[in-house]
Amino acid sequence: MTLQEEIKKRRTFAIISHPDAGKTTITEQLLKFGGAIREAGTVKARKTGNFAKSDWMDIEKERGISVTSSVMQFDYAGKRVNILDTPGHEDFSEDTYRTLMAVDAAVMVIDSAKGIEAQTKKLFQVVKRRGIPVFTFINKLDRDGREPLDLLSELEEILGIASVPMNWPIGMGKNFQGLYDFTHGRVEVYQPEDGKRFVEFDENGEVPASHPLTKNPFFTQALEDAELLLDAGNQFSEEEVVAGQLTPVFFGSALTSFGVETFLETFLEYAPEPHSHKTVDEEEIEPLNPDFSGFIFKIQANMDPRHRDRIAFVRIVSGEFERGMDVNLIRTGKKVKLSNVTQFMAESRENVENAVAGDIIGVYDTGTYQVGDTLTTGKLKKSFEPLPTFTPELFMRVQAKNVMKQKSFQKGIDQLVQEGAIQLYKSYTTGDIMLGAVGQLQFEVFKDRMEREYNSETIMTPMGTKTVRWIKEEDLDEKMSSSRNILARDRFDHPLFLFENEFAMRWFKDKYPDVELMEQFSV
């Protein structure tokens, strides 16, 4: 198979949703249909046959939430599928936003009883800004929920995107009978008594008159709704879907796996192949460019706690990866050898010899890489556009509970901060270590992982909310620091102030009008 044919097989997408909408469940069902698992909840590596969990971190298992992005791969219907399962909790939005830079499409999962919720709305806005195609799966049809027509209206009114249903529910909750699949000309029957999953339409495009469904009042209602939508609703347009202007909507129940395989088949038919990415000087790097290029969108420590390792996740943008190849690390200008490289099935992994544009690979990292790094070969010498960063608002002082374990404490901080889920600052005057986060859960996960993974108990003292502003090195003066504006350095050694509030920042500006305060550090 040629490089072009291999690249065209790739379908790389993320699943986004509000917590508890069923994101992890649908991920596991997709993996089941892809042959990667034998039952929901257990994920199997392709070569080893060992089973693992897609929510692999202990704290995720205990709380039932995803707080890291898992990358999983399988083959289905002639396509190579890469799924990125993103954190649903809002405190981990930074990790999710970066992950969305590495995909070509998004699947938005919505709880039929709750409709569009806060986190879904936030994530959709990111996807929309990037112009990523969105496919919608309305979940939990086996439970009582909102009217399907109301849910479609909400997509347009709240998210501002036109929608087109690809199938339609026949009843809901305890009356759920199946899906009227007008896209494929059939009815998908929920828990059929005769074991037949599909009722195919006859030559007139209808359910055969002799079939019991024709006398079912829920089916009659579904027919009326569908006819109304087909006449008055939006028409399906592959062009508009790929442009991110129209979302195809599928209904189903991830828990019972109903409607999921039909969704997968249709999604793979219309989801886009790998797309180009822009460099910092606006040059579009096409997937078929023969030179290898990629960017690191995530670094994850301790995917295997036995080895205390760290993996840098790379989205391949162009060309082909070959094991042992030398690449340029653009940030440092140095060459690095990519010899120990893996692909993933949750925390299971296997060595990879080759990968192409659209694939996600994991590079073992001993401290060489940073989130946002660009790797290239040949004539490609520019970095890709920077990944989004979030300025934290909540802060804590942190120290080791046992001073004798300072080494493991420092290693834990270094590795967890490297992942980018929490920010590190050091007081310029006292040397105190301070952590910044978008939300409280990040601190809880940090504390938990320090204990579990690094055997280092920590003392964390809340500092409340702060406003971060960077300054230029030449403006740095220790005398400016006070309890209301703490002078510190970030993990890259850039100077900054942590202001107690807006009033403290205004007071500082009045006193030091020549000092430029920056929301982001700029060289």
Curated annotation (Swiss-Prot):
Gene3D superfamilies in the cross-refs: P-loop containing nucleotide triphosphate hydrolases, Peptide chain release factor 3, domain III, Translation factors
Protein role: Increases the formation of ribosomal termination complexes and stimulates activities of RF-1 and RF-2. It binds guanine nucleotides and has strong preference for UGA stop codons. It may interact directly with the ribosome. The stimulation of RF-1 and RF-2 is significantly reduced by GTP and GDP, but not by GMP.
Key words, A-Z: Cytoplasm, GTP-binding, Nucleotide-binding, Protein biosynthesis
GO molecular function terms listed in the Swiss-Prot or TrEMBL record: GTP binding; GTPase activity; translation release factor activity, codon nonspecific; translation release factor activity, codon specific
Protein family membership: Belongs to the TRAFAC class translation factor GTPase superfamily. Classic translation factor GTPase family. PrfC subfamily.
Designated name of the protein: Peptide chain release factor 3
Gene that this sequence comes from: prfC
Keyword Nucleus on entry: no
Family annotation (Pfam families): EF-G_D2, GTP_EFTU, RF3_C
Compartments in which it is found: Cytoplasm
Domain of life per record: Bacteria
Binding annotation for GTP: 17-24, 85-89, 139-142
